[in-house]
Amino acid sequence: MNVSLYYSGTPVSSHSLLSKNGLSNIVLTCKDLPIPIDLLSLFFDILNERHPSFDEHMFLQMIRKPDDPENLSVFLKSAIWMLSHKRDLPGHYRLPLTCLVSTYSEYFVELKPRQPSTKCWFCKIAKDGLPFRVEGVHGFPSEAELYIVPSKEHAIESFEVLSGKKLYRSPSKKKHGYLIASNKPPLTSKYVEYDPSKPDTKP
């Protein structure tokens, strides 16, 4: 895999993948096969739509040299989804995208799984244990008003911001479970409505 980053000259595209990284072009070659910048831009858009926290800087790091197995897994799953589910994917993108999947899969040989975290994800992010607003949770309608709400080790209380919303259990395995409050039902069955009468049910 050969990657060349260009910082000067007129940008070949107005896409945020270039502008937010201060680049004018990204030239990527996979086993002598050039990867078009338009394909990289489309790939990033789909990856970011599926995983909003995966930003332009993370994507560039992934292209240059993957350094985290979990991020690499997300990266590859989105590429594979494009190949298997995106019906309008231009035919000339299939070979270079397949090459990316094949080549980047080999990085798993070098990368080791993350050490288990002993920190509570919710405690670290939430202020004073209060619900906080989030955008674009995969599995919920894009127009839904969403909040992350404490559960399990955290007391379930009545919060004013949750009026008119239902609570759903998250499938996350993170230490200290949490709930998602939404004014619209989820689009996937992996999120189920929270039943407070079953407190021992793990999210």
UniProtKB/Swiss-Prot annotation:
Name of the protein: Suppressor of RNA silencing p3
One Pfam family in the UniProt entry: Tenui_NS3
GO term, biological process aspect, one: symbiont-mediated suppression of host innate immune response
Family the entry assigns: Belongs to the tenuiviruses p3 protein family.
InterPro entries on file: Tenui_movmnt_prot, Tenui_NS3
Signal found in the keyword field: no
Presence of the UniProt keyword Signal in the record: no
GO-annotated molecular function: RNA binding
Subcellular location as annotated: Host cytoplasm
Organism: Rice hoja blanca virus (strain cr)
UniProtKB keywords: Host cytoplasm, Host-virus interaction, Inhibition of host innate immune response by virus, RNA-binding, Suppressor of RNA silencing, Viral immunoevasion
Oligomer status and interactors: Homodimer.
